[in-house]
Regions:
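Mid-to-C-terminal alpha-helical segments outside catalytic/metal-binding sites
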Residues: 51, 59, 100, 110-114, ...
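Catalytic pocket-lining loop regions of alpha/beta-barrel enzymes
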Residues: 1-125
Length: 171
């Protein structure tokens, strides 16, 4: 009901991972490196195969950490969507309802471009992990990656603020 109401009101829903309690392999920093991006990816997967995006067509979600593993595993995701859902849709159909932030905490143009190739310039929002991560890495690194990306300046400005203004209805 919450997701349906958010869609009715035009509110985007921010999906941020939680600690995976009781998972013994999540030690020595692996939660931040793998756990949270995995948790985000799993949540989105469950929303796709559970029909949430199909049932709530106006739902818009913002995924932290550049969508976790979603942009990197599109082929595998599409294979499994075909096998495990009745909706006959591809990941590329669902991403119209998804936005991702740039909180990958570094100057990785390559990571940004993988997300860009799936989500396009309109569905990427500037984001950071500050204050939990050093601001130079989280904010400065993400800014540097966007500025260095081989995309038009107008799209960089969209990512740096224009998309968020549009999504939140403040433009």
């Amino acid at each position: 009901r919450i997701l349906r109401r958010a869609a009715e009101l035009g509110f985007p829903v921010f999906i941020h991972p939680m600690d995976l309690e009781g998972i013994s392999f999540m030690d020595k920093g692996s939660m931040g490196a793998f756990g949270w991006p995995f948790d985000t990816s799993l949540a989105v997967w469950r929303m796709m195969v559970g029909g949430v995006f199909d049932e709530i067509s106006g739902l818009r979600v913002v995924l932290h950490h550049m969508g976790g593993m979603i942009p990197f595993f599109r082929h595998r995701i599409n294979q499994r969507l075909k096998k495990y859902t009745e909706f006959n849709r591809r990941l590329e159909d669902y991403v119209k309802q998804m936005y991702v932030d740039t909180a990958v905490d570094g100057e990785s143009v390559a990571d940004l471009m993988v997300a860009y190739s799936l989500f396009g310039p309109r569905n990427i929002l500037f984001g950071s992990d500050w204050p939990y991560i050093d601001p130079q890495a989280s904010i400065g690194g993400n800014m540097a990656a966007i500025r260095a990306a081989p995309i038009p300046d107008v799209e960089k400005e969209m990512i740096l603020g224009g998309n968020a203004e549009e999504l939140l209805g403040i433009r």
